Design a protein with these regions (language model features):
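Positively charged n-region of N-terminal signal peptides that target proteins for export
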Residues: 1-7
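Sec-dependent N-terminal signal peptides
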Residues: 7-16
Length: 152
């Protein structure tokens, strides 16, 4: 790996760790290394960022917390991979997104959550909704959402 890539990777990780408010660096490092982010890891990011649990929460409990709050439609197995459409839906539950008409009518259904994130330039429009998301992509999208939708 070139020196510039290493420096950029370190800066990126530091930015992510800061934007996720002190979440366990071990978990963030693990997510960055994943070819596919898991449901457990995705739910962990969401519950810790929202302050629904501390950073010691396990993935299974994170899934149950989001399920009980209605932020995910079903309690999936924690090691399942995450498709882009489902990642967009989980992220849309974190922030108050002023979406388009269909997004509001459907209460941010997965389809329209993804369309909104694409419309807002967070996710490239050419991406297939059912493609599996890598850990680094999930954190990139998380950071972009945080910058775009976080209340100032």
């Amino acid at each position: 790996m070139s020196r510039m890539k290493k420096i950029l990777s370190v800066l990126f990780v530091l930015f992510i760790v800061g934007s996720v408010y002190g979440q366990s660096s071990k978990v963030i490092s693990q997510i960055l290394e994943e070819d596919e982010i898991t449901v457990g890891q995705l739910c962990y990011l969401s519950v810790v960022y929202q302050g629904l649990a501390n950073e010691d929460v396990n993935f299974k409990d994170a899934i149950n917390i989001l399920y009980e709050r209605g932020q995910i439609p079903y309690a999936a197995y924690e090691t399942n991979g995450v498709a882009l459409i489902n990642l967009a839906f989980v992220y849309s539950q974190i922030w108050d997104i002023n979406g388009g008409l269909m997004y509001r009518i459907t209460n941010g259904s997965p389809r329209y959550a993804l369309r909104q994130l694409k419309s807002d330039g967070i996710i490239p429009s050419r991406y297939d909704p059912h493609r599996m998301v890598s850990g680094s992509e999930a954190l990139d999208i998380f950071t972009a959402c945080s910058l775009k939708y976080q209340k100032k």
